[in-house]
């Protein structure tokens, strides 16, 4: 099993005729992802990379049966694209776009309340179920099928963690990039719940960063509910207060959201943390050995 997506997931690409979307559509198709439709208003009837283009999400869904959308639409128009996908009742929308205005996302979040559409992102690398379905911008080749779930606020740190696991012979179920913006859709707890309920996932890597309280809330949830080992890493340990570090949400303000605070909370809730990015893989191995599941995680031929 996997979480959120699998080899049967039918995907549409919003903004497919843009150069970034075209590049990544080809990469996703090469990975084996079932991309059945693209959406660009005014470009309906075209075919790009063998994928039919429609004017609206509703039309694309009705014609192809797509249930998931990935958005590469420029920031000023991305919020409207999310709302259009929600209006079409898609199961999930994965928004890659960065620099969406915060107020736009506040409106989107409010609009999605009570609706069935799950939003992942924005400003995220996407979601990948190893060897089955890649939706987003992550490098597919580093991901190998196995039993470790990965959830992260950072794209590049996700790739680093996955690469280390694969090099150690440890495959993954699904890797979910929840995005680095202050207002996003799916959060750590949503993904941890999914991993906790997934029979194939035996351990989890959670990568956070400075800013906000999402990691602390996740730590408390892990302590109360998680039945599988979780290891963590917090980015931004050397960040000065008030200085934004890369992501819009990665800022320490009012003395809250420091790496030190997050690490302390995670450790007190039973989550082992890696001191540096290069130790994420070895920290997972240590936790797996303590839990007696290390051998069962070795699914990749090195």
Curated annotation (Swiss-Prot):
Q: In which pathway does it act?
A: Carbohydrate metabolism; tricarboxylic acid cycle; succinate from succinyl-CoA (ligase route): step 1/1
User: Catalytic site residues?
Assistant: 247 (tele-phosphohistidine intermediate)
Residues involved in substrate binding? 159
SUPFAM superfamilies from the entry? Answer: NAD(P)-binding Rossmann-fold domains (SSF51735), Succinyl-CoA synthetase domains (SSF52210)
Recorded hits in PROSITE patterns, A to Z, give: SUCCINYL_COA_LIG_1, SUCCINYL_COA_LIG_2
> Does the keyword 4Fe-4S belong to this entry?
no
Cellular-component GO terms for this entry? cytosol; succinate-CoA ligase complex (ADP-forming)
User: Which keywords fit this entry according to its UniProt record?
Assistant: Ligase, Nucleotide-binding, Tricarboxylic acid cycle
Q: Which Pfam family, just one, is annotated for this protein? A: Ligase_CoA
- Write down the InterPro entries for this protein, in alphabetical order: Cit_synth/succinyl-CoA_lig_AS (IPR017440), Citrt_syn/SCS-alpha_CS (IPR033847), CoA-bd (IPR003781), CoA_lig_alpha (IPR005810), NAD(P)-bd_dom_sf (IPR036291), SUCC_ACL_C (IPR005811), Succinyl-CoA_synth-like (IPR016102)
Q: What's one GO BP annotation on this UniProt entry?
A: tricarboxylic acid cycle
Q: Record-annotated residues binding CoA?
A: 17-20, 43, 96-98
The record lists the catalysed reaction(s) as: succinate + ATP + CoA = succinyl-CoA + ADP + phosphate; GTP + succinate + CoA = succinyl-CoA + GDP + phosphate
Q: What broad class of enzyme is this?
A: ligase
Cite the Gene3D superfamilies for this sequence: NAD(P)-binding Rossmann-like Domain, Succinyl-CoA synthetase domains
**Which Gene Ontology molecular function entries are recorded, alphabetically?**
nucleotide binding; succinate-CoA ligase (ADP-forming) activity; succinate-CoA ligase (GDP-forming) activity
- Please verify whether the record's keywords include Nucleotide-binding: yes
* EC number of this enzyme: 6.2.1.5
What task does this protein carry out? Succinyl-CoA synthetase functions in the citric acid cycle (TCA), coupling the hydrolysis of succinyl-CoA to the synthesis of either ATP or GTP and thus represents the only step of substrate-level phosphorylation in the TCA. The alpha subunit of the enzyme binds the substrates coenzyme A and phosphate, while succinate binding and nucleotide specificity is provided by the beta subunit.
Q: Into which family does the record put it?
A: Belongs to the succinate/malate CoA ligase alpha subunit family.
**What is the protein's quaternary organization?**
Heterotetramer of two alpha and two beta subunits.
- Classification via NCBIfam families: PRK05678.1, sucCoAalpha
> Can you say what this protein is called?
Succinate--CoA ligase [ADP-forming] subunit alpha
Q: Which gene encodes it?
A: sucD
């Amino acid at each position: 099993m996997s979480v959120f997506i699998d080899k049967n997931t039918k995907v549409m690409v919003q903004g497919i005729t843009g150069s970034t979307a075209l590049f990544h559509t080809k990469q996703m198709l090469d990975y084996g992802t079932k991309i059945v439709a693209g959406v660009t208003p005014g470009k309906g009837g075209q075919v790009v990379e063998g994928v039919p283009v429609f004017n609206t999400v509703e039309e694309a869904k009705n014609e192809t049966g797509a249930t998931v959308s990935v958005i590469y639409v420029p920031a000023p128009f991305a919020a409207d694209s999310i709302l259009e996908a929600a209006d079409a009742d898609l199961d999930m929308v994965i928004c890659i776009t960065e620099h969406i205005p915060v107020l736009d996302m506040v409106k989107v979040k409010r609009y999605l309340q009570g609706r069935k559409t799950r939003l992942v992102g924005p400003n995220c690398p996407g979601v990948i179920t190893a060897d089955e379905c890649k939706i987003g911008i992550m490098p597919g080749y580093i991901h190998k099928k196995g039993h470790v779930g990965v959830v992260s606020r950072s794209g590049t740190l996700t790739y680093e963690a996955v690469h280390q696991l694969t090099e150690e012979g440890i495959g993954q179920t699904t890797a979910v990039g929840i995005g680095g913006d202050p207002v996003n859709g799916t959060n750590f707890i949503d993904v941890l719940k999914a991993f906790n309920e997934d029979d194939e996932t035996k351990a989890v890597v959670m990568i956070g960063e400075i800013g906000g309280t999402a990691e602390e809330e996740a730590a408390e949830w892990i302590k109360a509910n998680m039945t599988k080992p979780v290891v963590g890493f917090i980015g931004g340990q050397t960040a000065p207060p008030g200085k934004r570090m890369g992501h819009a949400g990665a800022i320490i303000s009012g003395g809250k959201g420091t790496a030190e605070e997050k690490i302390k909370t995670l450790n007190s809730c039973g989550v082992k943390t890696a001191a540096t990015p290069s130790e994420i893989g070895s920290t997972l191995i240590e936790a797996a050995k303590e839990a007696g599941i290390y051998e069962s995680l070795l699914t990749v031929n090195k």
